[in-house]
Amino acid sequence: MEKNIEIKNLCKVYGNITILDDINFVAKEGRVTAFLGPNGAGKSSTLRILLGLDQATSGSATISGINYKDIRNPLFVVGATFDGLGSPSDRTVYQHLRIVAASNGIEKSRIDAVLAVTDIAHKKNESIGHLSLGETQRVSLATALLGNPQFLILDEPTNGLDPSGIRWLRNFLKEQSEKGKTILLSSHILSEVEAVTDDVVFIHKGKIIANGELKKIMKDTVSLEEVFFNLIQEGGKEDEVIL
């Protein structure tokens, strides 16, 4: 089975408000797919459904054809950064990772490995509450990597990172995709992911307005921001989706 993430005919309605309107896209194995749009566009709602944290009104969001809730030992399959660390502020970074590893049957040796990969080992004895936002992002990523998963689902991974941290993240994502990982990341800051993404999915007001390879979507434009605003001005209709 292909190691893809597939969002198919996904709809989410709260009362009489449509949050997601027939969302369709695929994040492919060995590629970085950037899920882009302004705050409130529907990115987090889509990821919440994908990770089993919310239910769709209709449609599906699957990982290798399986719903997240049906995956056995999910941390070995999917690593996600979403909704913070979920640990007490006085717990150290190492304690946090040790608890997550132990509760999921992950070998202790993986802790030092992910601390090294995310360049946060020097903070392992620091309390989580004393970390900067960028450092917390690195710990979230280290947590996601504990099970050495095939899939990485990252919600706004550049938040809180300084320029050197963003450069590091870009290199990290490139290395992981070259290893064959399937990476889906969301962001509302288009310029920060442009250098690392292979495929782009634009969402606006709950609808996909463009979807395809970065080089095809960019064409003769100078930036993803320009592409996005051009699409908005043109109306972003479904028949304008780029494949």
Give the location of each predicted region.
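A short, surface-exposed alpha-helical micro-motif characterized by mixed small hydrophobic
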Residues: 193-195
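ABC ATPase "signature
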Residues: 211-212
